[in-house]
Amino acid sequence: MTHQTHAYHMVNPSPWPLTGALSALLMTSGLIMWFHFNSTALLTLGLTTNMLTMYQWWRDVIRESTFQGHHTPAVQKGLRYGMILFIISEVLFFTGFFWAFYHSSLAPTPELGGCWPPTGIHPLNPLEVPLLNTSVLLASGVSITWAHHSLMEGNRYHMLQALFITIALGVYFTLLQASEYYEAPFTISDGVYGSTFFVATGFHGLHVIIGSTFLIVCFFRQLKFHFTSSHHFGFEAAAWYWHFVDVVWLFLYMSIYWWGS
């Protein structure tokens, strides 16, 4: 290893951005094949290569940060800026979905019956499963904060306990959302109501699955003593992401489930 006189991490050439891009192409193409031709072969290949890429890329980052010491305070500062910008881009991503929803619902056209929800649509009761989902995500926000404070205080047992509770609540939310989709009296093809409902809540559900995966990785890393009270940005980024998912759900609940019903 050559000596360096600066605090920045000079990353070695890596195949993972290329394999990640190829797996994303396979997944999106596979999704189209599944929708139009009922074939899941390409989608399965894309998901498999994506999972392998994520595993090996994260493995390399963990090696560089935890075992090789490349994540100096200057590098961590850059990672924090990167995570903040990523979350801002996600906020703008969801802004598009809310824009589509309010554009359609605030001034419903004659084709929709001049009312919202459109004629013939029976919306879900916001005081049933959606309210339970809201309480589950809010509880998970409390438990992830508990985990963060426990880590800052050096209490490993409480950190693992709180993190496990957060993951369990995230999985429970996903199962509730899946059951709600299964029992919904409308589909994604039921006009603009169905499309805005399923795209907005579906992408949020995808983000919950991504966040849960992020937290599961943190849980296993903490089992191996990877985090300390002063060096734990991987967990901190996961906590920021989880709080973002919480806040988006509150807006979804108030807009689509409560006001939109």
From Swiss-Prot:
- Per the record, the gene is MT-CO3
Membrane topology per the entry is: Multi-pass membrane protein
Spans within the Mitochondrial intermembrane topological domain: 35-40, 106-128, 184-190, 257-261
Put simply, this protein is called: Cytochrome c oxidase subunit 3
Segments crossing the lipid bilayer: 16-34, 41-66, 73-105, 129-152, 156-183, 191-223, 233-256
Q: Which PANTHER family match?
A: CYTOCHROME C OXIDASE SUBUNIT 3 (PTHR11403:SF7), CYTOCHROME C OXIDASE SUBUNIT III (PTHR11403)
Can you name the source organism?
Ovis aries
Q: Which residues lie on this side of the membrane: Mitochondrial matrix?
A: 1-15, 67-72, 153-155, 224-232
**Gene Ontology biological process:** mitochondrial electron transport, cytochrome c to oxygen; respiratory chain complex IV assembly
Taxonomic lineage is: Eukaryota, Metazoa, Chordata, Craniata, Vertebrata
* Annotated catalysed reactions: 4 Fe(II)-[cytochrome c] + O2 + 8 H(+)(in) = 4 Fe(III)-[cytochrome c] + 2 H2O + 4 H(+)(out)
Outline what the protein does: Component of the cytochrome c oxidase, the last enzyme in the mitochondrial electron transport chain which drives oxidative phosphorylation. The respiratory chain contains 3 multisubunit complexes succinate dehydrogenase (complex II, CII), ubiquinol-cytochrome c oxidoreductase (cytochrome b-c1 complex, complex III, CIII) and cytochrome c oxidase (complex IV, CIV), that cooperate to transfer electrons derived from NADH and succinate to molecular oxygen, creating an electrochemical gradient over the inner membrane that drives transmembrane transport and the ATP synthase.
Which residues does UniProt assign to the signal peptide? none
Q: Which key words are in the record?
A: Membrane, Mitochondrion, Mitochondrion inner membrane, Translocase, Transmembrane, Transmembrane helix
- CDD domains, A to Z: Cyt_c_Oxidase_III (cd01665)
User: What Gene Ontology molecular-function terms does this entry list?
Assistant: cytochrome-c oxidase activity
Localization terms from the record: Mitochondrion inner membrane
Q: Where would you say this protein principally sits, based on its record?
A: mitochondrion
- How would you summarize the oligomeric state and partners of this protein? Component of the cytochrome c oxidase (complex IV, CIV), a multisubunit enzyme composed of 14 subunits. The complex is composed of a catalytic core of 3 subunits MT-CO1, MT-CO2 and MT-CO3, encoded in the mitochondrial DNA, and 11 supernumerary subunits COX4I, COX5A, COX5B, COX6A, COX6B, COX6C, COX7A, COX7B, COX7C, COX8 and NDUFA4, which are encoded in the nuclear genome.
* Family to which this protein belongs: Belongs to the cytochrome c oxidase subunit 3 family.
